[in-house]
Amino acid sequence: MTTADSNSSATRGSHEMADGSNRVPNDEPYHRKSPESCENANFFVRAMRASFGYRKTSLTILVFLSVIATVLLSYYDSSLEFSVSLPTDKSESKILDHSWDVLQEIARDEHTYASEANDRVHDYLEDIIGFLVDKKSYMEYDNDLNNTHSFLRQTAPSTVTYYESNNLIVRINGSDPELPALLLSAHYDSVPSSFGVTDDGMGIASLIGILNYFSAKQTSQPARTIIINFNNNEEFGLYGALAFLSHPWFKQIKYFLNLEGTGAGGKAILFRGTDYGFAKYFKNVRFPYASSLFQQAFSARLVHSETDYKYYAELGHLRGLDLAFFRPRDMYHTAKDNIANVNKKSLWHMLSSTIDFTNGVVGGEIDLDVEAKQKEAAAFTSIFNYFFVVPMTFVFGVNVLLMVLVPLVSLISLALIFAHRKWSVSLVTFFKFPLSFILSIFLLDNFSSWFVVSVNNFLPNSSAGIIALTYFSFFVLANYLLLNGINLLFWKFKGTRHDEKLVVILQISFMFWVSLIWSTANIAKSQFNGEHSGEFLLTLLYILQAAGGVFGLLCWLFKRSRTVHTNNQELEPLLEHAVEEGYGAHVEQEGHISSSASSAISVNVIESPPPTKHYSYDWSIQFLFIVPISSFLSYNYGWLILEGLKKTLQESATSEYLVFRALKLLAVVVAVPYLPFIFKVNRIVFLVTIFLFVYGLGAIVISEPFTEANPLKLRFLQTIDLDNSPKSNLVSASGRANSSIAEILRDLPSVKESETEVVCNAKADGMTICNYEGLNPHLAPGTKNAQDLLSVKVLSNSSSSINYPFGMLSGKFEIRAEKNRECRLSFREDTGGKRSSGVVKTVVVYKNDLKNSNKVNAMKAPEGFSQDDYGNFVYKNMTGISDLKLNKLDWNRPYRIGVEWVASLDDSDTQPTLKVSVDCYWAEIGQIAEKGKIVDRIPAYTELLHYSPNYVTWANLDQGLVNVKKSVLV
């Protein structure tokens, strides 16, 4: 052996590992440079490496910054205080002040349709409207009190409604009569249990503000005509809007903006729009707040309420928008919807949005006037007072492009990487994240069901944030422990040339891709009608996730290589910074090797050793692509929809289930962007997450679901049944099961004094209703007892008809309800103990004296609505009418009703009779003079308001607070 050979063998031996491989041991220097060479590196380079290298400290700082920024920016975006400013212009300030005064006067007391306070509000608004209209010659006013806009029509299957309208309608005639008009609409009635500040006093006050604005001297005549509908009785059937469809002015209208309130204060949100063509004009609003997530929620019936938008869009075929307050729902329709719980900024947000939007549409011709564009649903949102809207066809097109382009680029990149870069991914690396993700969701679901729901199922009502935080912490911890546990257990099978971060990014991108396919298919299936308009968020999240994945693959593909010389002059290309561990690998061993060296070095090994530090900075670009924006979007819009839904858990067990599903989904979606980096986070993140989880557990156990700020919402109805002997007088309180209703009722003074029994019965969908004998109401002056409140007199009995069994049976009756506006009739055939519905084919509402009215022949009357020679309203439906709802304006006029019906043929010798059940409703709250004393009209309701705990609010269970029942046979 020559000396050279001996030296070569010695050198080779010094680099031979115990397993016979030719790797350089970690404790032996690889470069010829001295260890001090890195120490003498430029200070700036070292600072950059320390700050932006893929280190635990750098990553941890970015994680904390992202979480904090997500929460703070979302709070700013939804905050009325920070995102909306009061007007500085004197004229606008004056308009706001006047509108606020109007709101205070409207909300002085409860003013449902069946109350004298409703008349007071009507007359008050009429005075203001008359004063403002007189300021401009091109303004005019019409009042439906002339009874020309009453209707009798089918409003539900087998239900017919009679309604007398007293809408207040203003027309601001435009300078160009050829332009179709814009309708602005709000309703001035409230429910019996609410002062109606947000629902819909703010809408009415905003319309008064619009009138103030256009009647001002400095405001010129608009080019487009504006019609304003101050409508009544929206709460129990949208009847004011329905009546307006038959008004002569309605024919001019093509567009509308409806102002509503389904919460109590806060910011007014654009939550529905008929189409993109009209929704895009909301960009003119100075403080836009919008989300088509609510549009999708309404389409899916996740929110159990409706607005006038429904009739304007569906029956009126108008193009328009729905702008409404939406939180908190537990104060909605209760006495807490009052002036004390709102402020001027809330009113200004709706008022300024109405002014800005109206000016943007009425200033001149818009593209929808001249182009017969098809209505195309829109996806829209707002961020920091910037409004974004796109048609659903655009969302569909982008989705299709992404579904094709991203997989194509990714697959080509992967093929090139595996072919030339030798990126090896072991089965453990490939399967551990999907396994961890699925198992974590399974564990989260069981944790939610077996702990959170069982311990405090109503907690989202007051502390949805605590639950979301606990779920988020649990999900992150589960993935952290599972992923690192798998790495620990299967460390021998862990590949050496891989990037765990990139693998997880690609797998999450694939999950979003599958979800995008599902969403796109649904969009196409719904024919782009907006049922899935909230899913544009999925498109944005996929773009961000895919961008991080594609960027990582391209970095792998185009990574610069360095060459290492062997002793026989062979060249070995190596990936810079990541040889054994691969691109982006997270190695942090201490040593003296500089992975940033770029020159070729002559060594006597075939493979280079693993780098001791990873100074690649492209990870930070991936992080910025994926985490901050995705985290903000997921949290901001997830929390927004949760704010609108969380209080609905008081309405049914189904809603409770949906709320907890939304909480789990929010936690998972917000956590997903952080999961690719979970391998690298500092132990501080782990400890903080544990602390948050433990804190959440404690809070879930001890927190109260119902507080004064987040009350328990119960519903009230007092029912007096005159058919019973003696009459029954039951108070019914309805709410969620296991929500302490019985305990609240048993503590009432009247219940304890009379030793009345409180009986509770379970109802469908997790609800319960409790009944007890209540205090007698005093509903009308001069009535001595309940029998004086309601009487039904049969004027023409069908039993005397000679047409049976081959012809129509008919009957007439008169209902006298003292000081009343609302009744409901139910028709059932009564034959030998058998009862059937749908036998009535024609109903007649007599407007004049019965003596001057002829019998209506059902064979001659047309199907649907008609009027006879005396102006009586006739409705015929041969499929059957089961219910007739009556709404009149005259407090003292009796209801005079005629029916024609067909009896069923059976073997009974008894001639059939028609049972008519009459339910009349009273809703007036306050006091009344009776026998020289001032007494409460509905003392049972007043007692509940006074003696219920401060964490309880009361709403009406039906269209009135007191229901008096009586039935007759016709």
UniProtKB/Swiss-Prot annotation:
It is a multi-pass membrane protein. Its EC number is 3.4.-.-. The chain crosses the membrane at residues 57-77, 398-418, 424-444, 466-486, 503-523, 536-556, 621-641, 659-679, 684-704. The active site is at residue 234. Its cofactor is Zn(2+). Zn(2+) 1 binds at residues 187, 199, 260. Glycans are attached at residues 146, 173, 446, 461, 738, 797, 877. Residues 25-35 have a biased composition (Basic and acidic residues). One of its GO terms (cellular component) is vacuolar membrane. Zn(2+) 2 binds at residues 199, 235, 333. It comes from the Eukaryota. Residues 1-35 are annotated as: Disordered. It is found in: Vacuole membrane. The record marks 332 as: Transition state stabilizer. Residues 78-397, 445-465, 524-535, 642-658, 705-970 are vacuolar. Binds 2 Zn(2+) ions per subunit. Disulfide bonds: none annotated. May be involved in vacuolar sorting and osmoregulation. PANTHER family: METALLOPEPTIDASE M28 FAMILY MEMBER (PTHR12147), VACUOLAR MEMBRANE PROTEASE (PTHR12147:SF58). This is Vacuolar membrane protease.
